[in-house]
């Protein structure tokens, strides 16, 4: 008997130790979960993730989270083969579409020809145009932007173009139109950017600016068929919660839910769990990354993990025998590490169903995130194209 509903929850940026190729990214020593645990000195309480095996899959347990003996599910880690360490790379690879050619990055800012086109289209001047922390850039330039109506253009170590503007100065819909236009400028072949991100903010002055939930990602369209496309073609339902819709440009998705926050995202998961469908629900919870990882805030990161863990308890309670849950991440963003960028890490893989035959077994280190998608496809009798399925290990047959 295969599983009727498969739920995947991506804890955005919750890595579990430096990947084998971390040196290429200058990320040796990164360990998001490990360093958050160290910061909490034993006070990080994750009972539900713990009983699923979040410490079992690590070489050393997370401080405060004992190894489960036995774990109620199966556990392992996944390595990324994509060229980058952005959300897009990670999610696409999970769905059988690893990004093997590095996308364009802009350590010195965007070329003048792109800036000129943005200024001409928007009728607004562009300022900053260099790598910057998103919270620091509005602190340093937000008041000026309010006075002048300019566009704050910045990037990071990833293949992203970010445009920030105060919502009272440039309405959100106008900012989206500018970002949609920017998307057309960097779809290749000369420049290929993974994501254009609209970054609206509010507040009276630099000490009180906050970025709003009206953030919107304009992703590169998937450059090939994904496992979600394959599931839909086979007649299964595909539901996206959070920025899944943005990451895949709406492709391969029947219904999408926009999240205001992690807790709002878990409300959506609870809502979807009440629905009768046959297929796949793919959820991204971005607060770990956006609110705490980039800001190098281990305290907030740990609290977000504990808040998620509480909500996870309800998901486990509500699961039907023919439901399958997989929890993972798309990359790391170690709040105890240097810089403000993502970190190249292995990601956790936690798998649970009330009816699984062999809980408490290690799934090992998977050699690509695509193993996750391949497993979902095999469950639904669809031929996997990329990755090695671990369906037989986790099945209820």
UniProtKB/Swiss-Prot annotation:
Mn(2+) 1 binds at residues 12, 330-331. One of its GO terms (biological process) is nucleotide metabolic process. Isomerase that catalyzes the conversion of deoxy-ribose 1-phosphate (dRib-1-P) and ribose 1-phosphate (Rib-1-P) to deoxy-ribose 5-phosphate (dRib-5-P) and ribose 5-phosphate (Rib-5-P), respectively. Its main location: cytoplasm. Belongs to the phosphopentomutase family. Coiled coil: none annotated. It is found in: Cytoplasm. GO terms for molecular function: magnesium ion binding; manganese ion binding; phosphopentomutase activity. Binds 2 manganese ions. Its EC number is 5.4.2.7. The keyword Metal-binding applies. It catalyses: 2-deoxy-alpha-D-ribose 1-phosphate = 2-deoxy-D-ribose 5-phosphate; alpha-D-ribose 1-phosphate = D-ribose 5-phosphate. It holds the Pfam family Metalloenzyme. It comes from the Bacteria. The keyword Isomerase applies. Keywords: Cytoplasm, Isomerase, Manganese, Metal-binding. Its cofactor is Mn(2+). Pathway: Carbohydrate degradation; 2-deoxy-D-ribose 1-phosphate degradation; D-glyceraldehyde 3-phosphate and acetaldehyde from 2-deoxy-alpha-D-ribose 1-phosphate: step 1/2. It is an enzyme of class 5 (isomerase). This is Phosphopentomutase. GO terms for cellular component: cytosol. The gene is deoB. InterPro entries: Alkaline_phosphatase_core_sf, DeoB, Metalloenzyme, Phosphopentomutase_DeoB_cap_sf. Mn(2+) 2 binds at residues 289, 294, 342.
């Amino acid at each position: 008997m295969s599983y009727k509903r498969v739920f995947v929850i991506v804890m955005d940026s919750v890595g579990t130790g430096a990947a084998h190729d971390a040196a290429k990214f200058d990320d040796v020593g990164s360990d998001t979960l490990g360093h958050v645990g160290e910061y909490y000195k034993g006070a990080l309480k994750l009972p539900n993730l713990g009983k699923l095996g979040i410490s079992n899959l690590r070489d050393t347990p997370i401080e405060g989270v004992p190894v489960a003996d036995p774990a109620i599910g199966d556990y392992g880690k996944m390595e990324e083969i994509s060229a980058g360490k952005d959300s897009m790379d990670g999610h696409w690879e999970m769905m059988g579409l690893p990004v093997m050619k590095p996308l364009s990055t802009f350590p010195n800012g965007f070329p003048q020809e792109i800036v000129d086109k943005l200024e001409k289209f928007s009728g607004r001047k562009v300022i900053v145009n260099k790598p910057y922390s998103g919270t620091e850039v509005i602190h340093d330039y937000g008041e000026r932007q309010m006075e002048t109506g300019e566009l704050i253009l910045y990037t990071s170590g990833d293949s992203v173009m970010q445009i920030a503007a105060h919502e009272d100065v440039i309405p959100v819909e106008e900012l989206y139109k500018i970002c949609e236009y920017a998307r057309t400028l960097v779809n290749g072949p000369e420049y290929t950017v993974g994501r254009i991100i609209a970054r609206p903010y509010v507040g009276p002055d630099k000490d009180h600016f906050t970025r709003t939930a009206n953030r919107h990602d304009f992703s590169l369209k998937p450059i090939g068929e994904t496992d979600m496309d394959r599931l839909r073609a086979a007649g299964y339902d595909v539901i996206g919660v959070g920025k899944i819709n943005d990451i895949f440009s709406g492709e391969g998705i029947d219904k999408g839910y926009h999240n205001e926050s992690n807790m709002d995202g878990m409300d959506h998961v609870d809502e979807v769990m009440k629905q009768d469908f046959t297929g796949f629900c793919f959820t991204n919870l971005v607060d770990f990354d956006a609110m705490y990882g980039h800001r190098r805030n281990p305290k907030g990161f740990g609290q977000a993990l504990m808040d998620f863990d509480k909500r996870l308890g309800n998901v486990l309670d509500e699961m039907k025998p023919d439901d399958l849950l997989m929890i993972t991440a798309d990359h790391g963003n170690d709040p105890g590490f240097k810089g403000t960028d993502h970190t190249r890490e292995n990601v956790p893989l936690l798998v649970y169903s009330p009816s699984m035959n062999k809980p408490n077994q290690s799934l090992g280190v998977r050699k690509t995130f695509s193993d996750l998608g391949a497993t979902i496809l095999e469950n639904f009798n669809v031929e996997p194209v990329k990755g090695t399925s671990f369906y037989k290990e986790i099945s209820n047959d």
